[in-house]
């Protein structure tokens, strides 16, 4: 099944999960999986939150990310992936002062 993110409406999520600025998402959700292409402009972030009933996979398409994962910090660049398993917590921050962070995320729903 093809999903064309260019055909999906981009929606602003202000202070998503308690983060800074707007998180922009183009989302496909079939009730079983949430599949998203996201954008964080400079100065924007997704706040620290836990995944108690699901997990999340984030693949960096372009830009630089700082990911807070439990007690650690991880730097991510294009081609790298972050995995937050069920029962863990994370945050995603655009680490660039000049370029947007583009990413692809999958959240399997239980």
Predicted regions mapped to residue ranges:
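Glycine- and acidic-residue-biased ligand/ion/polar-headgroup-sensing regions
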Residues: 53-55, 59-65
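A generic "binding-loop/recognition-motif" signal
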Residues: 42, 53, 72, 88-89, ...
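Short acidic-glycine-tyrosine-enriched beta hairpin
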Residues: 72-86
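Well-ordered beta-strand scaffold positions
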Residues: 33, 64, 72-74
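Histidine-centered metal-chelating micro-motifs
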Residues: 45-47, 66, 82, 87-92
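Conserved short histidine dyad/triad with adjacent acidic residue
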Residues: 36-51
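Ligand-binding loop in jelly-roll beta-barrel domains
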Residues: 86-110
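A short, N-terminal "cap"/entry segment at the start of jelly-roll beta-barrel domains
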Residues: 1-32, 47
């Amino acid at each position: 099944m093809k999903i064309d993110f260019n055909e999906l409406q981009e929606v602003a999520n202000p202070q998503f999960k308690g983060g800074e600025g707007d998180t922009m998402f183009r989302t496909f959700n079939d009730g079983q999986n949430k599949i998203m292409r996201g954008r964080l402009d400079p100065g924007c972030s997704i706040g620290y939150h836990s995944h108690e009933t699901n997990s999340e996979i984030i693949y960096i398409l372009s830009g630089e990310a700082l990911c807070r994962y439990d007690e650690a910090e991880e730097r991510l660049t294009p081609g790298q992936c972050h995995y937050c398993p069920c029962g863990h917590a994370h945050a995603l921050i655009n680490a660039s002062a000049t370029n947007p962070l583009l990413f692809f995320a999958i959240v399997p729903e239980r």
